[in-house]
């Protein structure tokens, strides 16, 4: 059985890849980062509340702490999009579009500049988002496949095929 995908690596795809990595192989690190961000926010809130309560004169520090807190909140809420933007800057010319063929022994990804072969043993985790399937190869490398472009079978058949070949469950991510 052979499955085929055509994927454009745009900001939406790269954001999905970042989300897939964050919720699979980076899960523990992501949790620690969010706990740290929460602690920073609590310290900032206490500091701001104390400066307001003491009625001290307006200083740059009084404005910088809330501004830093807003930045932490924004970065926490937009983490995947920010990582997607960084990844978009690092996409090599000619690799913005990829064709992939999944076969019995492995899968092959072709772009306008290269052709790469991968074995299923390299896959650490499989994540399924509403539009994409994400294969995590390491903490910093993933591949996304647009489910709308699937040919050669249904998404259910491909999900079962991947679970069989990798020995890993397909994790559903919203």
Residue spans for each PLM region:
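Generic beta-strand structural signal
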Residues: 101-102, 128, 137
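Conserved beta-hairpin
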Residues: 75-117
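A membrane-cytosol interface segment of integral membrane proteins
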Residues: 132-174
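Single-pass alpha-helical transmembrane signal-anchor segments
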Residues: 45, 66-75
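Short, surface-exposed beta-strand-loop junctions and turns on beta-sheet-rich folds
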Residues: 115-117, 124-126, 140-143, 151
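Hydrophobic alpha-helical transmembrane segments
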Residues: 55-69
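N-terminal membrane-targeting/pre-transmembrane regions
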Residues: 1-40, 44-47, 52
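Phosphoinositide-dependent membrane-docking surfaces
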Residues: 107, 116-133
